């Protein structure tokens, strides 16, 4: 028999899951939630405990009922038995023969003023009987008033005689009470009661017996029902049909779930609604919810864990120490913008890269390999601009040694500190290159002093950080710097296994018009050959060609060698891992699964709506958005610009990059911008002729930049244009009310004397009385000597009326002002 879950047990026992959990814990069974499974022997223990409790409860209730019944019976026995006494009195009166009454002489009944003696309480009464003081006895029991016999009857109606509760002494001369007739011998019968008179005691006894029978019958039925239920369970348990087993993923839509169970989506939605979940066929449900619903439909559920197929690709297997061979060190050049990183690399490579960069600022990551004393060194040049934080971090992650370039005339700057933090976070040794020492205002010692604050203490001062003074322009200290790099590399004993499938990191990626997607990859282990099938993030492909940093074709790339890879189906993201796989089918499957997984995550993130989100969306309706379609030549630039733009967003204006990509601006980008009311920004790319024509037709703003500073400044200006202008009040003048005049058609006219400034016809005015503003409004008319005027200057008198306001009094101050709108700027 299969194990049951807590919620199933709760449903069968008609209890709450929480109560079942508490009961299980009470008998020593640990369960965590309503989805926990319970062993069969634990379930039997729980059922026994519950049955025991139920039986005890029923027993207590039965005992309680019996006690109540006994108490009721005792109560009835202790009360005066009025019905029986009345019957006896009636029967005694009726059974007495009339002859006895008539045969007795009348004179013997009452002598003179004597009255009949009242019956003694103890005479003529059975033991245990009490006297009834009921004055409303039956009429036959009363003594009648007989004029002929001289018998005194009861007093007239309404005159009740109170009888004393205790017996009194017998009066002399009163006849004894009439004896009760004896029953015939041999018969022990109760006196005959009057025909039609109810026997209350018998009726009560009958009712009591009937009630006891009903209770006994109900108890019998209850026990029978319980026995039948137990028999039914015992019969059903051995032959219970095993539920159908289904396998469900961790996440799926309602429609997919219904299909797995072979049910209609409407049935599943109805069942979800019964649990208070409102869902459409395209909404996702989690595995826990699906398990509960499937169990209700009679299915045994197994949740299939989503296997991350690419985990085995990302985890590197340890290499045999014998297979490791020395590899060139990977050196990252980092530092603040314009401190001479690329110039230093030019001096090392003996080329002129700086001239090719826009504005002399590195916009992309560059990877190069140089040779010194027969040994190779790989250099990675990262941008110093603040927008390229992610690219610097990525450079630090793949590197062995970091060269921190600091200008001797400028000192430590913000990006210098950031570069230090990235290198320390990656656990990379730092070599400080103090550049521009050839300048007259160079202060290398000041740079060293500043860097000690960040834990970089020169070896000459007793620290462990290598400092080299260089001049990229004059090529001073270059040889010494390379020697230090090789020395630090030797200390680290850098090795890799070249005899296995390659694994590397994408440093940069772009879409080349003639060559298609191109990825700059730094091989970290193994050897990458032409013809290898690779998976790179969400993309895959077969390596069509490999190009080194000088643009020459190579057949293979060994560890620590930067190469450009051609042959991918799409442009990968910078930072993606390149892994060689067995065949193209495997590569395609993995890439497609990764794409699907990413798409599901994006859909999941966008489809989840809570009340808090709803309120947020309502509030966001008041926020203005600047939509942007961004295109750049390389992926690193796209990433950097997106990060910089997101930092520009304020509470009032939000920058929203609705689409970003690598490559030229196309018609699709223009159409997207037209549909979403966006502007198109190109960084180092231009629109083609068709896109330009479409932009002119649709009146889409297309802007192209080569330097990131200019791009960010223009976006700030555009955002400032979306801000609501500030309203500023400008006071024009003040005037005092010297006299007021009433006019039937006009209302109250204020005679003013301008104290300061001027009062204009187009201005707004406020009426101030005793320092309190009592009204604000517009000027209806402004006159001087019965002539309409545009304004009245200081020191002059005028007449003024205010729109829809006549409560003007002498001594009031009239203040004229205007509201000016001031253009706001982004702070």
Curated annotation (Swiss-Prot):
HAMAP family for the chain: IF_2_B
Residue ranges of the region described as G5: 471-473
Family assignment from sequence similarity: Belongs to the TRAFAC class translation factor GTPase superfamily. Classic translation factor GTPase family. IF-2 subfamily.
Region (Disordered): 49-205
Disulfide bonds, paired cysteine numbers: none
GO molecular function: GTP binding; GTPase activity; translation initiation factor activity
Job of this protein: One of the essential components for the initiation of protein synthesis. Protects formylmethionyl-tRNA from spontaneous hydrolysis and promotes its binding to the 30S ribosomal subunits. Also involved in the hydrolysis of GTP during the formation of the 70S ribosomal complex.
InterPro entries, per the entry: EF-G-like_DII (IPR053905), IF2_II (IPR044145), IF2_N (IPR006847), P-loop_NTPase (IPR027417), Small_GTP-bd (IPR005225), T_Tr_GTP-bd_dom (IPR000795), TF_IF2_bacterial-like (IPR000178), TIF_IF2 (IPR015760)
Biased composition (Basic and acidic residues): 50-73, 96-106, 116-129, 137-150, 157-168, 182-205
Span of domain tr-type G: 326-495
Keywords for the protein's UniProt record, in alphabetical order: Cytoplasm, GTP-binding, Initiation factor, Nucleotide-binding, Protein biosynthesis
Residue span of region G2: 360-364
Record's protein name: Translation initiation factor IF-2
Keyword match Thylakoid: no
Highest taxon listed in the record's lineage: Bacteria
Annotated stretches, region: G1: 335-342
SUPFAM superfamilies cross-referenced by the UniProt entry: Initiation factor IF2/eIF5b, domain 3, P-loop containing nucleoside triphosphate hydrolases, Translation proteins
Organism per entry: Carboxydothermus hydrogenoformans (strain ATCC BAA-161 / DSM 6008 / Z-2901)
A GO cellular component annotation in the UniProt record: cytosol
Entry-linked Gene3D superfamilies: 1.10.10.2480, P-loop containing nucleotide triphosphate hydrolases (3.40.50.300), Translation factors (2.40.30.10), Translation initiation factor IF- 2, domain 3 (3.40.50.10050)
Location of this chain's protein in the cell: Cytoplasm
Ranges for region G4: 435-438
């Amino acid at each position: 028999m299969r194990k049951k879950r807590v919620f199933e047990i709760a449903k069968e026992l008609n209890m709450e899951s929480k109560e079942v959990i508490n009961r299980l814990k009470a008998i020593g069974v640990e369960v965590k939630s309503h989805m926990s499974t319970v062993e069969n022997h634990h379930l039997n223990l729980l059922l026994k405990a519950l049955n025991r409790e139920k039986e005890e409860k029923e027993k207590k209730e039965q005992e309680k009922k019996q006690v109540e019944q006994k108490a009721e019976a005792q109560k009835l026995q202790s009360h005066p038995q009025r019905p029986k006494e009345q019957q006896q009195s009636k029967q005694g009166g009726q059974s007495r023969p009339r002859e006895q009454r008539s045969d007795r002489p009348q004179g013997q009944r009452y002598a003179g003023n004597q009255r009949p003696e009242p019956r003694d309480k103890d005479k003529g009464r059975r033991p245990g009987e009490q006297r009834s003081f009921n004055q409303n006895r039956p009429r036959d029991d009363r003594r009648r008033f007989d004029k002929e016999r001289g018998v005194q009857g009861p007093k007239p109606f309404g005159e009740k005689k109170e009888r004393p509760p205790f017996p009194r002494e017998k009066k002399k001369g009163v006849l004894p009470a009439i004896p009760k007739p004896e029953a015939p011998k041999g018969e022990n019968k109760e006196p005959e009661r009057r025909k039609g008179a109810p026997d209350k005691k018998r009726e009560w006894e009958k009712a009591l017996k009937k009630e006891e029978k009903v209770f006994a019958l109900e108890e019998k039925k209850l026990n029978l029902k319980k026995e039948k239920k137990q028999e039914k369970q015992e019969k059903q348990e051995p032959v219970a049909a095993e539920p159908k087993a289904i396998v469900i993923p961790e996440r799926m839509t309602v429609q997919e779930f219904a299909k797995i169970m072979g049910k209609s989506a409407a049935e599943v939605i109805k069942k979800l609604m019964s649990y208070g979940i409102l869902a459409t066929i395209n909404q996702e449900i989690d595995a826990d919810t699906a398990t509960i619903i499937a169990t209700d439909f009679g299915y045994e559920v197994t949740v299939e864990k989503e296997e991350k197929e690419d985990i085995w690709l990302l985890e590197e297997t340890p290499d045999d120490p014998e297979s490791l061979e020395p590899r060139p060190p990977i050196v990252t050049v980092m530092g603040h913008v314009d401190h001479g990183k690329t110039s230093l690399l030019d001096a090392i490579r003996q080329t002129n890269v700086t001239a090719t960069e826009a504005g002399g600022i590195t916009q992309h990551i560059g990877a190069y390999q140089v040779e010194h004393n027969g040994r190779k060194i790989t250099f990675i040049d990262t941008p110093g601009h603040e927008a390229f934080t992610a690219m610097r971090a990525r450079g630090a992650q793949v590197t062995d040694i970091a060269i921190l370039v600091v200008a001797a005339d400028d000192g430590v700057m913000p990006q210098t500190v950031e570069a230090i933090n990235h290198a320390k976070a990656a656990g990379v040794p730092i070599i400080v290159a103090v550049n521009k020492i050839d300048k007259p205002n160079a202060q290398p010692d000041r740079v060293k002093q500043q860097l000690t604050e960040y834990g970089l203490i020169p070896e000459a001062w007793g620290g462990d950080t290598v400092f080299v003074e260089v001049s990229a322009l004059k090529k001073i200290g270059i040889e010494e710097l390379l020697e230090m790099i090789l020395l630090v590399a030797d200390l680290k004993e850098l090795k890799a296994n070249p005899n296995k499938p390659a694994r590397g990191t994408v440093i940069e990626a772009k879409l080349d018009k003639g060559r298609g997607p191109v990825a700059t990859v730094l091989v970290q282990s193994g050897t990458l050959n032409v013809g290898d099938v690779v998976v790179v993030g969400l993309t895959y492909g077969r390596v069509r060609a490999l190009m080194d940093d000088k643009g020459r074709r190579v057949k293979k790339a060994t560890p620590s060698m930067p190469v450009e890879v051609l042959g991918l189906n799409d442009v990968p993201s910078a930072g993606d891992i390149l892994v060689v796989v067995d065949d193209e089918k495997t590569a395609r499957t993995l890439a497609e699964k990764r794409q699907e997984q990413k798409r599901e995550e994006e859909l999941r993130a966008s489809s989840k709506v809570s009340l808090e989100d709803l309120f947020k969306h309502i509030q966001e309706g008041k926020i203005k958005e600047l939509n942007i379609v961004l295109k750049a030549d390389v992926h690193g630039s796209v990433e950097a610009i997106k990060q910089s733009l997101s930092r520009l967003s304020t509470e009032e204006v939000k920058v929203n990059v609705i689409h970003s990509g690598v490559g030229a601006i196309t018609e699709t980008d223009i159409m997207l911008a037209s549909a979403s009311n966006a502007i198109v920004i190109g960084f180092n790319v231009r629109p083609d002729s068709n896109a330009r024509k479409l932009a002119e037709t649709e009146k889409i703003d297309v802007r192209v930049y080569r330097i990131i500073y200019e791009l960010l400044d223009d976006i700030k200006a555009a955002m400032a244009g979306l801000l609501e202008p500030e309203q500023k009040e400008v006071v024009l003048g003040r005037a005092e009310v010297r006299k007021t005049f009433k006019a039937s058609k006009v209302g109250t006219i204020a005679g003013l004397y301008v104290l300061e400034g001027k009062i204009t016809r187009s201005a707004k005015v406020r009426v101030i009385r005793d320092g309190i503003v009592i009204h604000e409004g517009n000027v209806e008319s402004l006159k001087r000597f019965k002539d309409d005027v545009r304004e009245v200057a200081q020191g002059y008198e005028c007449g003024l009326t205010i729109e829809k306001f006549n409560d003007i009094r002498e001594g009031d101050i009239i203040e004229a002002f205007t509201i000016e709108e001031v253009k706001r700027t982004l702070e």
